Curated annotation (Swiss-Prot):
Chain's gene name: ahpC
Isomerase listed as a keyword: no
EC numbers: 1.11.1.26
Principal location: cytoplasm
Function field: Thiol-specific peroxidase that catalyzes the reduction of hydrogen peroxide and organic hydroperoxides to water and alcohols, respectively. Plays a role in cell protection against oxidative stress by detoxifying peroxides.
Catalytic activity: a hydroperoxide + NADH + H(+) = an alcohol + NAD(+) + H2O
Quaternary context: Homodimer; disulfide-linked, upon oxidation. 5 homodimers assemble to form a ring-like decamer.
Family: Belongs to the peroxiredoxin family. AhpC/Prx1 subfamily.
Name the UniProt record assigns to this protein: Alkyl hydroperoxide reductase C
Amino acid sequence: SLINTEVKPFQATAYHNGQFVEVNE
């Protein structure tokens, strides 16, 4: 389950709008 996957706040693959997008904020 992606919901329970631990992710880093600045380099993470976020599930957005039905697709995977790389988040680098």
